[in-house]
Amino acid sequence: MLIGVGTDIVQILRIEKILHLYPELFAKRILASKELRQFALLNKTSHATFLAKRFAAKEAVSKAFGIGIGQGINFKDITILNDDLGKPIVEVSASYTKKYSSFNIHLSLSDDYPVCVAFAIVESSC
C-alpha cells in the first residue's frame, strides 16, 4: 500500500555557496555518520553535488512520509547509501521506524549541473 510520494529539487550552485561560507558545518548538519565517512573520501570537486543530492533525497523521503524535515524527522534520521551498482539505499533511524510497522522506500536521484532532483516513494510492506 502506498504511504506517500515526495520530490525535491536543489540548485547545486546554492550548495557551492554554502560550502564556500561553511566548508564543514553544512555537511555535519545534514549527513549521518555513514554519509560523513563517504563524504570525507570524495574529491572536493564532488562535495557540492554529493551534498545537494543528499539534501534533496532526505527532503523527498520526508515528504513521502507526509511530513517535512524538522516536523518529526531530521536530516540525520535518514541515511542515503548506494549498493554495488550505485542504486540509492535509504536507511531510516530506529527512533523513527517505530512510528511505522514496516515499509519500503524507493529513491531515484539525478543531477545535471546546476540542479539535482530526488524522487521518493514510501510503501507499506504489509
Swiss-Prot record:
Keyword Magnesium: yes
Cysteine disulfide links: none
Superkingdom per UniProt: Bacteria
Positions annotated to bind Mg(2+): D8, E59
Molecular function (Gene Ontology), one example: magnesium ion binding
Coiled coil: none
EC number: 2.7.8.7
Pfam families associated with the record: ACPS
Top-level enzyme category: transferase
Catalytic activity: apo-[ACP] + CoA = holo-[ACP] + adenosine 3',5'-bisphosphate + H(+)
GO biological process: fatty acid biosynthetic process
Cofactor: Mg(2+)
Compartments reported by the entry: Cytoplasm
Similarity field: Belongs to the P-Pant transferase superfamily. AcpS family.
Name of the protein: Holo-[acyl-carrier-protein] synthase
Organism: Rickettsia akari (strain Hartford)
